[in-house]
Amino acid sequence: MASSDETIFDLPPYIRSRKTPFFPLCFPSLNDPETGVSWKDVPISSQVSVRIYLPKITDHEKGEKLPILVYVHGAGFCLESAFKSFFHTYVKHFVTEAKAIVVSVEFRLAPEHHLPSAYEDCWEALQWVASHVGLDTSSLKTSIDKDPWIINYGDFERLYLWGDSTGANIVHNILIRAGKEKLKGGVKILGAILYYPYFLIRTSSKQSDYMENEYRSYWKLAYPNAPGGNDNLMINPTAENGPDLRGYGCSRLLVSMVADEARDITLLYIDALERSGWKGELDVADFEGDYFEIFSPDTELGKNKLRRSTSFIR
């Protein structure tokens, strides 16, 4: 009889299928030679793990509390990983520039796990982070599922969410939920960063047709039985009887867009948010090209976009 952890299919380095859930976690890496950032992988449940990043802490900075960001990567709900090298490098540079703790979520992907699995996984990760509030290092003796970096350095008065593309869509839906449900310990989300948020909103622009078709294809793959289809409230915040954006669960928001086919969609989302009566602070960043900060971080545009987002953290 096969053991429960047996590999039943292996096509290295791309696919490995096991009989039980498995996370290919890395050993902790301390003081990255390029950035000084430390990171480690932490499983928080049988379905979800996170990679936690800590900036270099000098002797005179010990005891200083740092902002906490929960990061959700993009790629159509069905591709990539929080552990992918380009996301990893991107987050390291962000951590260095922002001087913040980042918790990057490794969530389940479609089509193996249809939505709303990813939404639930990221909410679970956020609640896990919130569960550290008010703890000290003595709690680690009885709470093996808690992380000392978050306890020792995390400032829960400065908790942010951050996502790009479909990751930004997940963050948007978390903000809707956080406006209705409490986080553990009464923790509040201060702000959120939405880079190129992924929505299905009908526009009158012919330029948006291609992007809308592509977005619809990914949505159908990720959530084939979505109630309301393309007008599901999770993907179309402007739909009839849509979500109450007035209740967004944060007080500050940075929305980034670029001059591409999705720009009109983002503008309609921003308009809906402004008309909703949400009382928070809205900051809009308009750039020339997308994903330079991830795929070309050493270019001037990539650096400018990184600085723009990290300057939002305070």
Curated annotation (Swiss-Prot):
EC class, as a word, reads: lyase
One biological process term from GO is:
alkaloid metabolic process
Q: Which UniProt keywords apply?
A: Alkaloid metabolism, Lyase
Q: List the disulfide bonds.
A: none
* Protein name per UniProt: Hydrolase 4
Q: Does the keyword Lyase apply?
A: yes
What GO molecular-function term can you cite, just one? hydrolase activity
In terms of InterPro entries, this protein maps to: AB_hydrolase_3, AB_hydrolase_fold, Carboxylest/Gibb_receptor
What family does the database annotate? Belongs to the 'GDXG' lipolytic enzyme family.
Q: Where is the active site?
A: S165, D260
- Pathway involvement of the protein, from the record: Alkaloid biosynthesis
Instruction: Report the Pfam families cross-referenced here.
Output: Abhydrolase_3
Q: Could you tell me what this protein does?
A: Component of the seco-iridoid and derivatives monoterpenoid indole alkaloids (MIAs, e.g. vincadifformine) biosynthesis pathway. Catalyzes the conversion of O-acetylstemmadenine (OAS) to vincadifformine. May also trigger the formation of additional unknown MIAs.
Residue ranges of the motif Involved in the stabilization of the negatively charged intermediate by the formation of the oxyanion hole: 73-75
Listed EC numbers: 4.-.-.-
Taxonomy of origin reads:
Eukaryota, Viridiplantae, Streptophyta, Embryophyta, Tracheophyta
